Amino acid sequence: MISSLNPLFTTHRSGVIAQQFFASSAAASINSVSSLKIAACSKTKLVDQSPLRQSGNHQLLSSDFNHLQSLKNDYAEEKYKSRCEVLKEQVKMMLDQEMDVVNQLELIDDLQRLGLSYHFGDEITSVLSGIYNRKSMNKMRNQWGLYATCLEFRLLRQHGFDVSQEIFDCFKDEKGDFRPSLCEDSKGMLYLYEASYLESENEESNLEMARRFAAKTLKKNLDEKRVDQDLVALVQHALELPLHWRMMRLEARWFIDIYEERSNRNPILLELAKLDFNIVQAAHQNDLTYTLRWWRSTCLAEKLTFARDMMVENFFWTVGIISDPQRGNGRRILTKVVALITAIDDIYDCYGTLDELEVFTTAVERWDVNSIDQLPDCMKICFLALYNFVNEMAYDALKEQGVNIIPYLRKSWADLCKAYLQEAKWFFSGEVPTLQQYLNNAWISISAPAFLVHAYFCVDYPINKDHLQYLDNYHKIIRCSAMILRLTNDLGTSPESEVLNVGDVPKSIRCYMKETGACEEKAREHLRFLITEAWKQMEEAQTLDSPFSSTFNGIAVNLARMGLCMYQHGDGHGHQNSEPRDRILSLLFEPICCLA
């Protein structure tokens, strides 16, 4: 439970959260899994009866195994990698050369948005450290104006530097309000809006005030057509969802097209961005074919006919969370984790009786293959697939690092299954919990803690034994990431019909409405407020409190971003409309045209 989110019904100003954020959620397709359950199953015994089983009505991206196995990407060839290395050296020279501070910041910002910054981590840190430690910066800021100040603030905070929000006080009048004359500077307003999302918990409301002011101004300037044409797409994009909340790999694909149209584009950066995108895509395709072969070898798709067979979608999650090409092994392991989570989720959602689910949960808690004898064969196979996967992962860790990680992996799966079981009990009893009761369980049932525990052992090498207690207790950064993922999921998968169907598994919107008597829109507004508060907590957790590496912290943040990516336009995981499909195709299967 995230104790700091306890005051769930406190009167609040929701502020301005991205103008189109989940605007279409009410029209999204509901996750039909829960509506397929039959309450009569709650009384079904394991023997002497054959309960009626339901199959999920899932609308998924086609995963033609033979076609996907035959994928061939020319950008895996050495000649493209060699050209990429030449371009990287030229960019390093740019970062090393003397230039105006604002130009340095703009170069770093472009590298990040083009998806190239992972190549230049040391160089970027060196440049930003120099800017941060320069004693003359306060005098320079007075000459910069709003745009450059906001850019500096955002980049420094993104990279963990302690920058006070008082940096914006020089743009306020004697009453403490932002000066009205700033409204004429749409570029400055855009960058103020983006910077305002780098807000930490327990800060004064300066950044919230900045966000409201900037959003209102940008929307007004758009309506009155007072935004420069080369900024219109960027402003609309930001108001839909802020940069800091976006899935960065998808953002890179979008920004490459925007950057190409800029009059001041750097041809070296543009060529490198396109080439690197395609090379990384080739690496991702290689990882995808590996995980597809693994999935076929488990036979889970054939044995669990009611479950979602969606390895492409599962892999898309891991690409959004850990996209660097050198992290292929971690991507493969985590795709397996997502696949197993999806299969087990469907067992609890649309297959198992309550008695069977209790047996399955106990077996996972005890980590005991002898506990599954009474279960249907498909549930036995699923348990053994999980059992073998976890034990194999733990074997590799023990062999290579001398650390037994089974207790931590087991606990994460046991906690997940217990949370699934609690939801099943609520369904079978027809009970609608309070919002706090729901969230205390739901941040675990969204599966983020289990995913992040496995992610830690994939990316932090060698394993730091001092970190394990924080992992076992689900450190704040894990809980915040999980809460954001849960709330975005609920916003994206809870249309009006879900609220009205008494038999469905309750979600946060329905819980809030029942407890407070609020209308659906007020409930959604409250969830958006909770998402913003969780982001503030996560900002503070990763900069001040987290014992983990920056790599792991980044994965936790990226998992939250994936929630916004997948559920922004409805249920992008279980019921895809054209938007999620197009995103998957553009990232995994469609290279960018690179002219020779």
Swiss-Prot record:
Mg(2+) 3 binds at N489, T493, S497. It is an enzyme of class 4 (lyase). The Asp-Asp-Xaa-Xaa-Asp/Glu (DDXXD/E) motif is important for the catalytic activity, presumably through binding to Mg(2+). Pathway: Secondary metabolite biosynthesis; terpenoid biosynthesis. One of its GO terms (molecular function) is myrcene synthase activity. Binds 3 Mg(2+) or Mn(2+) ions per subunit. It catalyses: (2E)-geranyl diphosphate = beta-myrcene + diphosphate; (2E)-geranyl diphosphate + H2O = linalool + diphosphate; (2E)-geranyl diphosphate = (Z)-beta-ocimene + diphosphate; (2E)-geranyl diphosphate = (E)-beta-ocimene + diphosphate. Its main location: plastid. It comes from the Eukaryota. A motif (DDXXD motif) lies at residues 345-349. Mg(2+) 1 binds at D345, D349. The gene is TPS3. Keywords: Chloroplast, Lyase, Magnesium, Metal-binding, Plastid, Transit peptide. This is Linalool synthase TPS3, chloroplastic. Residues 1-39 form a transit peptide. One of its GO terms (cellular component) is chloroplast. Its cofactor is Mg(2+); Mn(2+). Mg(2+) 2 binds at D345, D349. InterPro entries: Isoprenoid_synthase_dom_sf, Terpene_cyclase-like_1_C, Terpene_cyclase_plant_C1, Terpene_synth_N, Terpene_synth_N_sf, Terpene_synthase-like, Terpene_synthase_metal-bd, Terpenoid_cyclase/PrenylTrfase. Belongs to the terpene synthase family. Tpsb subfamily. CDD domains: Terpene_cyclase_plant_C1. Expressed in flowers and fruits.
